[in-house]
Amino acid sequence: MCKETVTGCIDEYFEYKFGRLDYRSLKFEHIHLDIDNYQGNAVINYNEAKYPFTRIIEHKHFEFGKQPSTIITKEYPQEYTPSDEPYYPINDEKNLKCFNKYKLLAEKDSRVIFGGRLGQYAYFDMDDTIASAILLTKKKLSI
């Protein structure tokens, strides 16, 4: 039997049968700077309340660029609205109750595998995302 993998929002997949799940979104600000180096690293996270952004990405450091200028991206947390891109699930009692209804519905459909942050309504770091995908694939495909 052919299986479909869904990594999008599980509530959207089921046409919001039990209501909408809440998410957190992001806003990105891209800035070109006429300096050769801004922060010396590709990514620096800012978790102190005094900063309005959560991280700054300096793209040239992913490829060890030697350009005379640089581009940075500041990432800001943002309330989610249906017209925004959902990035992170909101892990609270109300949303977990709603998600569990969708999860039960998903378990009844053997043709679909739900994965990732939005499909499993869980926060994953990248290493956890890869590990979860491998584990889920082995389990669902019996390999």
Predicted regions and their residues:
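Short, well-ordered coil/turn residues at beta-beta hairpins
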Residues: 1, 7-8
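C-terminal segments that line or cap access tunnels to active or ligand-binding sites in enzymes
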Residues: 2, 12-143
